A protein has these predicted regions:
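Short, Lys/Arg-enriched N-terminal segments with co-localized hydrophobic residues
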Residues: 1-5
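Metalloprotease/metallohydrolase-associated module, dominated by Zn2+-dependent proteases
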Residues: 7-76, 97-200
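Active-site recognition of the HExxH zinc-binding catalytic motif
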Residues: 84-97
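Surface-exposed beta-strand edges and their flanking turn/coil or helix-capping segments
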Residues: 53-55, 82-85
Length: 200
């Protein structure tokens, strides 16, 4: 557990290590250490707080892992919201590992199986008209987990054209997608606000 003398999370490398530590705590508390450890990345994800890859996209000589990305544009949300996003994505990993179909429409629509998995882990899940049971909010249980483990807010964020000036903006596993400037395109591109997977 982090002590009172923990350095502020204002450094990218320290933040990346910290997120791995938080995921380990979440895996232990909410998933009985059953989740395969993903490769955690921090990259901009337009319109989403995070995503998890359907396939194992990270490889070395012996191991392949899923990617769990947290959007760099929203890292400075309260820690209980970051934890809620990690639990949300952990539910997708759990579903993948246990052959539970928790989404439909090519991973875009979060169904009632996803809702049940997330609520079993103390999250508050509400329905989004387009994306299903995806709106994810922390509960008192989530906050208690953060307090008991002395988790602290992350104080670094990537400011892009998408994130500047959107204080209080909502996306992905937290609320409706953020409106973004659109580039002309002859095809339609859909992005899941929770897992960030895009489909054409």
């Amino acid at each position: 557990k982090e002590g009172a003398h923990m350095k502020k999370l204002t450094n990218y490398q320290r933040t990346a290590q910290y997120l791995n530590k938080v995921f380990k705590l979440i895996n232990e508390e909410y998933f009985n250490n059953e989740l395969e450890v993903p490769t955690i990345t921090i990259q901009s994800t337009v319109g989403a707080y995070g995503h998890v890859s359907v396939n194992k996209v990270w490889h070395n000589d012996t191991v392949a892992t899923h990617e769990l990305n947290l959007s760099a544009d929203y890292l400075n949300r309260p820690i209980e919201n970051i934890v809620a996003t990690l639990i949300h994505e952990g539910c997708h990993l759990y579903a993948l590992q246990n052959n539970i179909k928790d989404t439909s429409n090519r991973g875009i629509y979060h169904n009632k199986r996803f809702k049940a998995l997330a609520e079993e882990r103390g999250l508050q899940i509400s329905r989004h008209e387009t994306y299903g049971w995806t709106i994810t909010e922390p509960t008192e249980k989530t906050l208690d987990f953060c307090i008991i483990n002395q988790l602290e807010d992350i104080q670094i964020v990537r400011q892009t054209a998408y994130s500047i000036g959107i204080s209080g903006g909502k996306a992905g596993s937290g609320s409706a997608p953020i409106a973004r400037p659109k580039k002309p395109s002859s095809t339609r591109k859909y992005i899941c606000p929770c897992c960030g997977n895009s489909f054409r």
